[in-house]
Curated annotation (Swiss-Prot):
The gene is PRAP1. This is Proline-rich acidic protein 1. GO terms for molecular function: triglyceride binding. The lineage of its organism: Eukaryota, Metazoa, Chordata, Craniata, Vertebrata. It comes from the Eukaryota. One of its GO terms (cellular component) is extracellular region.
Length: 151
């Protein structure tokens, strides 16, 4: 099987080199430069530059720009309430609270399966020792060497 594949590949390569198999040609219309050169950044980024909305009077009239206030973690003295709640802030805070329990470490449930260490138990309690089962022998023990040492 390998020989057949090898021979077929060699025949195809030889025919291609000899010119018997026509090489695939791309029409001239299809030869398009896909990547812009590094020396022409205007073409790469586009010739038109969009100005920010503050400088464009038409957009400011349609969409008034409100600069959002930054939320700070500083505590305000009593008597001063919270400032105005920006639109979307409440939803953001609810999302943060919702994800808080997911992002926190999982609770420790080891005490359900393992007793606390002796230092944490406080007073010392008597230890319960498990006694092995004792077999009371009456008379001499039977010789069982033949089980472990076959002859």
């Amino acid at each position: 099987m390998r020989r057949l594949l090898l021979v077929t590949s060699l025949v195809v390569v030889l025919l291609w080199e000899a010119g018997a198999v026509p090489a695939p040609k791309v029409p001239i219309k299809m030869q398009v430069k896909h990547w812009p050169s590094e020396q022409d950044p205007e073409k790469a980024w586009g010739a038109r530059v969009v100005e920010p909305p503050e400088k464009d009077d038409q957009l400011v009239v349609l969409f008034p720009v409100q600069k959002p206030k930054l939320l700070t973690t500083e505590e305000k003295p009593r008597g001063q309430g919270r400032g105005p709640i920006l639109p979307g802030t409440k939803a953001w805070m609810e999302t943060e609270d919702t994800l808080g329990h997911v992002l926190s470490p999982e609770p420790d449930h080891d005490s359900l399966y393992h007793p606390p260490p002796e230092e944490d138990q406080g007073e010392e309690r008597p230890r319960l020792w498990v006694m092995p089962n004792h077999q009371v022998l009456l008379g001499p023990e039977e010789d069982q060497d033949h089980i472990y040492h076959p002859q």
